[in-house]
């Protein structure tokens, strides 16, 4: 277009009405923008901006309506206009209606030459500010924000400020996009229309052609603007190419690929410097120079950021610099091929790096569909008492974190015994079973040669040994969110104790298929009630089956410790086991927890918080022959079949009373089943099979032989849930018990391979759990756990009925017959003195003698069922008393003080990084191999949506302001710390003591054993108002560190 006149097909007109504002004189004005684009050369753009009020629009509507009616005689097609109102004219709805009507009117006139060429329309835009198209990609000058101001030379918005460009949280759109010179009919008043640097000119032409009127006018028409649209034949497309490179640089920067981002910045700068040489417009030339300088500064800052990790070899203190992800931690997605999956731990994977053979935890964070550009990515690297990040891998859909594995497991797995919680202990018994009475004891952990992992030792001891895998306990069975947050270093247990949900929903199809096949086969209940006593085929009169008793309510066993069953000095032979299908057919439905590594965290409903209530509610059947002992050595005594049926019913009420009390399927049998069914396409089990030591040939020479049927009955017994209340009775109870048996209890050292068993080995205490995972060469560790043993010595022993059935149906259910009459009474001595950890202990020799003596006297007097019931009632009363006494035992405050200080140091470091945990709960608190606190890994990613654990909120581990309208500050984590410490000090959760919640006037309920310093700390941390919470003041975390509760703590040592 070289003249102001041209055909209507050569120009496209677009109008927008935006930014309604109040004029200083009291009325509302609207910003009207008109743009004319050449269809032949879309780069030729002219723009005019005016500010008009409602009365101006109404006048223009009346004039254009008159012209349209005279020209076309179809006034009904003309768009209507909003009617004027006196009241409510400043309402948002009224203003928006007027703005939309004005925009529709102008856009309607853009398609009719008689209207857009009219004098009335040109008078409407008279006095506006005209901008040539060359300035649309020019300096970042803002439009006038008020009609009362003088109209300066208008440009388009580019960067909002220099600080936006240099900020780590820079918005890519603000860097790469400018005014696009186009407007749509349905544009929002607050929408900014811009022409991107990478906008294709063909796209602009397409938009213009779409708005071309269907009826082309042949007559000439005047241009809307007084000046012509001058062609810019010398302009090149270097701005578009440079814009594409800058966008790629921003994208790589968001992905933390700083090397590629720096290269794209440099290429874009080179292109801008070449193109600006021939630029005729001085305004655009200045704009390009300013942009070039900004891109160069950005490229230099990226180079310095990449070089920063190499300059500082030592660990950096927490802060903004350490939060920036170093280039060395970033790994390409192909790195995932180097990791081999060893197992599934709840929502994370236990993997091994095949290059270094080290084990790690692999956690995946799925990217959200809408990433928040305002949220900065923070990757902490130097946070004490938190698991370390080895590397991270970013793919198209997820962010994978390769994390350090916390060797000690979860803290709550160790302290659950002190908090009156006992988790279900299920042992995987092997097919090979020794013939001597086994002994259960704890063994210290062995050092692992591999960095970052410690597997259970598989070394051999003197004599044959049967190793059983203890299932680690926890307050929470595995199933959960996230987790928030879920967890990084160890199995995360999202669901809480009273949650009835199973983790089957989270398992893969392979696991579900395997379990469904096992679950289709039911246990034959009739065969269990009619079983006879398992005896060797040799000398039957001189042997009997016994079982090592364990405590009636044990807690979790340390993952770094394991149980060993020691046998005597005689040679042994493995018992022949029934076919795998036969043993599996006797099993019930097993939940997925028994096929996953994190099954160690499953809990037992029978031994849960309401254990004392269940003891009262269970009503045993009348058992007449409970203490009836046979005179002589013949073990032929048996019970009446009717009573055996009732006993089976009583047994069933315990072993099948809850969904959690289910049998354990042997991992070895499951593996054999999977191998035999490989042709059917059954998936392999992703678990680590517990270790087993096969008996040597020499040890198997003198072992008595067992029949196949006897071994099958033993296997079915082992597959059942443990009869912890000793309610399961059969003919085996009274078999082989002479009246002289209790008096001849011998020293348990007879069965130890070394000949001597120390007293502390025979009777474990709660301190063993902590000492097993502590390096005794470190004095702080000894201080941390030494007080637990002395506290546990105050617990008394519980009188338990020592019958053959009580021994055989113990919690761990490890059974084997004696081999020889000379070993018969020694078996009782061994099993009576050996014990597992916590709440209940085995009876002493004198207690066992008195109990059996009462049974013998009852038989001689012909005591009936009423006297037998009385004996059981007394036993349960004594159990209740002992349980109440043990419930008064708490964790020493010295241990809690150390753990709390380590958590304070970790939270303070995270806060300095800019991370607020919000939902810190017991699932996030782990232990390292030295027994010190390690939190799960907390980070923040711009592409991953932050989430809060709903169960943690319901359990009051989260502050009241979490999820509310108030701001979530660092004080949220201090509330979580108070909730955790409350549970450690009192033995009960906060929601149990305060089910109605905590408000501004709530007084916390804490037992008298809690010190005044601890009470004060908890009371100040659990303040409803976050501003009044300890640690939320001006001094911050220093207020917490200076609290009297932490007086003995050396903070300088903890922060090293």
From Swiss-Prot:
The keyword Chloroplast does not apply. Pfam families: MIT (PF04212), Pkinase (PF00069), PX (PF00787). Residues 204-223, 426-504, 529-588, 628-662 are annotated as: Disordered. Its EC number is 2.7.11.1. One of its GO terms (cellular component) is membrane. Residues 8-132 form the PX domain. The modification Phosphoserine is found at residues 281, 422-423, 426, 446, 448, 454, 493, 527, 577, 599, 602, 634, 655, 658, 661, 787. ATP binds at residues 795-803, 823. Residues 276-304 form the MIT domain. Residues 473-482, 544-561 have a biased composition (Polar residues). Residues 212-222 have a biased composition (Basic and acidic residues). It catalyses: L-seryl-[protein] + ATP = O-phospho-L-seryl-[protein] + ADP + H(+); L-threonyl-[protein] + ATP = O-phospho-L-threonyl-[protein] + ADP + H(+). Its main location: cytoplasm. Residues 443-454, 576-587 have a biased composition (Low complexity). Residues 343-444, 789-1046 form the Protein kinase domain. GO terms for molecular function: ATP binding; phosphatidylinositol binding; protein serine kinase activity; protein serine/threonine kinase activity. It is found in: Cytoplasm; Membrane; Early endosome. Gene3D superfamilies: Phosphotransferase system, lactose/cellobiose-type IIA subunit, Phox-like domain, Transferase(Phosphotransferase) domain 1. It comes from the Eukaryota. Keywords: ATP-binding, Cytoplasm, Endosome, Kinase, Lipid-binding, Membrane, Nucleotide-binding, Phosphoprotein, Repeat, Serine/threonine-protein kinase, Transferase. The PX domain is essential for its localization to the early endosomes. May be involved in transmitting sphingosine-1 phosphate (SPP)-mediated signaling into the cell. Plays a role in the recruitment of PRDX3 to early endosomes. Belongs to the protein kinase superfamily. Ser/Thr protein kinase family. S6 kinase subfamily. Interacts with SPHK1 and phosphatidylinositol 3-phosphate. Interacts (via PX domain) with PRDX3. This is Ribosomal protein S6 kinase delta-1. It comes from Mus musculus (Mouse). The gene is Rps6kc1.
């Amino acid at each position: 277009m070289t003249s102001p006149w041209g055909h209507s097909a050569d120009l496209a007109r677009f109008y927008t009405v935006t930014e309604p504002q109040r004029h200083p004189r009291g009325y509302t004005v609207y910003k009207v923008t008109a743009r004319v684009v050449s269809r032949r050369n879309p780069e030729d753009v002219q723009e005019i901006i005016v500010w008009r009020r409602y009365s101006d629009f109404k006048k223009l509507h009346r004039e254009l309506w008159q012209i349209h009616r005279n020209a076309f005689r179809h006034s009904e097609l003309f768009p209507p206009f909003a009617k004027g109102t006196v009241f409510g004219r400043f309402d948002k709805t009224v203003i928006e209606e007027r703005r939309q009507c004005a925009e529709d009117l102008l856009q309607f006139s853009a398609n009719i030459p008689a209207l857009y060429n009219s004098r009335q329309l040109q008078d409407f835009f008279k006095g506006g500010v005209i901008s040539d198209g060359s300035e649309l990609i020019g300096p970042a000058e803002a439009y006038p924000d008020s009609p009362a101001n003088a109209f300066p030379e208008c440009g388009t918005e580019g960067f909002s400020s220099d600080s936006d460009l240099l900020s780590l949280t820079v918005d890519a759109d603000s860097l790469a996009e400018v005014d696009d010179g186009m407007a749509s009919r349905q544009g929002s008043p607050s929408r900014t229309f811009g022409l991107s640097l990478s906008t294709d000119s063909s796209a602009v032409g397409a938009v213009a052609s779409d708005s071309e009127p269907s009826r082309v006018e042949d007559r000439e028409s005047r241009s809307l603007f007084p000046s012509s649209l001058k062609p810019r034949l010398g302009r090149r497309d270097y701005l578009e190419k440079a814009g594409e490179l800058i966008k790629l640089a921003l994208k790589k920067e968001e992905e933390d690929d700083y090397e590629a981002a720096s290269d794209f910045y440099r290429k874009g700068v080179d292109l801008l410097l070449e193109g600006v040489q021939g630029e005729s417009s001085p305004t655009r030339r200045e704009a390009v120079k300013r942009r070039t300088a900004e891109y160069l500064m950005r490229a230099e800052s990226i180079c310095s950021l990449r070089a920063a990790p190499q300059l500082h070899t030592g660990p950096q203190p927490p802060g903004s610099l350490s939060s920036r992800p170093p280039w060395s931690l970033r790994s390409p997605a192909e790195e995932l091929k180097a990791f081999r999956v060893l197992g599934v731990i709840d929502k994370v994977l236990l993997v091994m790096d095949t290059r270094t053979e080290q084990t790690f935890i692999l956690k995946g964070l799925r990217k959200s569909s809408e990433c928040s550009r305002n949220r900065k990515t923070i990757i902490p690297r130097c946070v004490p008492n938190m698991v370390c990040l080895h590397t991270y891998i970013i793919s198209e859909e997820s962010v994978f974190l390769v994390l350090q594995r916390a060797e000690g497991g979860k803290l709550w797995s160790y302290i659950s015994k002190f908090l009156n919680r006992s988790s279900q202990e299920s042992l995987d018994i092997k097919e090979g079973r020794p013939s001597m009475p086994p002994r259960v004891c704890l063994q210290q952990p062995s050092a692992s040669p591999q960095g970052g992992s410690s597997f259970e030792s598989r070394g051999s001891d003197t004599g044959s040994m049967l190793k059983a895998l203890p299932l680690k306990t926890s307050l929470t069975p595995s199933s959960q969110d996230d987790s928030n947050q879920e967890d990084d270093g160890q199995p995360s247990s999202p669901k809480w104790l009273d949650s009835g949900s199973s983790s089957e929903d989270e398992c893969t199809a392979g696991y579900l298929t395997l379990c469904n096949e096992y679950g289709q086969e039911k246990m034959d209940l009739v065969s269990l009630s009619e079983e006879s006593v398992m005896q060797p085929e040799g000398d039957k009169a001189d042997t009997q089956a016994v079982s090592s008793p364990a405590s009636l309510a044990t807690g979790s066993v340390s993952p770094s410790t394991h149980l060993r069953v020691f046998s005597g000095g005689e040679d042994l032979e493995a018992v022949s086991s029934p076919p795998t299908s036969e043993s599996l057919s006797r099993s019930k439905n097993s939940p997925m927890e028994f096929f996953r590594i994190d099954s160690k965290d499953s809990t037992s409903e029978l031994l849960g918080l309401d254990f004392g209530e269940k003891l009262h509610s269970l009503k045993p059947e009348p058992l007449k022959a409970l203490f009836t002992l046979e005179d002589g050595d013949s073990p032929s005594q048996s019970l009446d079949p009717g009573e055996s049926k009732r006993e089976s019913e009583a047994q069933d009420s315990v072993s099948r009373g809850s969904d959690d009390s289910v049998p354990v399927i042997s991992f070895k049998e499951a593996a054999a089943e999977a191998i035999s069914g490989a042709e059917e396409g059954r998936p392999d089990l992703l678990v680590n099979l517990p270790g087993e030591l096969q008996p040597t040939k020499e040890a198997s020479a003198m072992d008595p032989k067992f029949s196949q049927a006897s071994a099958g009955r033993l296997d079915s017994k082992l597959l059942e849930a443990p009869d912890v209340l000793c309610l399961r009775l059969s003919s085996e109870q009274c078999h082989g018990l002479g009246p002289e048996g209790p008096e001849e209890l011998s020293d348990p050292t007879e069965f130890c391979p070394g000949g001597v068993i120390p007293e502390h080995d025979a009777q474990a205490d709660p301190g063993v759990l902590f000492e097993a995972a502590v390096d005794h060469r470190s004095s702080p560790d000894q201080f941390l756990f030494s007080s637990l043993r002395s506290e546990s010595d105050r617990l008394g022993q519980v009188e338990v009925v020592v019958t053959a059935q009580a021994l055989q149906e113990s919690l761990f259910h490890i059974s084997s017959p004696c081999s020889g009459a000379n070993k018969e009474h020694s078996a009782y001595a061994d099993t009576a003195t050996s014990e597992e950890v916590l709440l209940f202990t085995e009876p002493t020799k004198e207690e066992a003698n008195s109990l059996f003596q009462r049974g013998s006297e009852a038989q001689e007097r012909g005591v009936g069922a009423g006297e037998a019931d009385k004996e059981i009632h007394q036993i349960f009363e004594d159990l209740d008393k002992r349980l109440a006494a043990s419930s008064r035992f708490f964790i020493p405050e010295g241990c809690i003080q150390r753990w709390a200080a380590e958590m304070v140091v970790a939270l303070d470091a995270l806060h300095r990084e800019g991370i607020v945990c919000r939902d810190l709960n017991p699932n996030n608190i782990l232990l390292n191999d030295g027994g010190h606190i390690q939190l799960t890994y907390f980070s923040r990613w711009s592409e991953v949506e932050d989430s809060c654990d709903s169960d943690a909120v319901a359990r009051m581990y989260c502050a009241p302001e979490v999820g509310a309208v108030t701001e979530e500050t660092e004080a949220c984590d201090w509330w979580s710390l108070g909730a955790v410490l409350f549970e450690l000090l009192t033995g009960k959760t906060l929601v149990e003591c305060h089910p109605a919640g905590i408000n501004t006037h709530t007084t916390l309920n804490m037992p008298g054993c809690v010190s005044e310093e601890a009470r004060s700390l908890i009371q100040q941390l659990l303040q409803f108002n976050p501003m009044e919470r300890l640690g939320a003041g001006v001094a911050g975390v220093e207020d917490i560190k200076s609290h009297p509760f932490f007086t003995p703590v050396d903070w300088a040592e903890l922060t090293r």
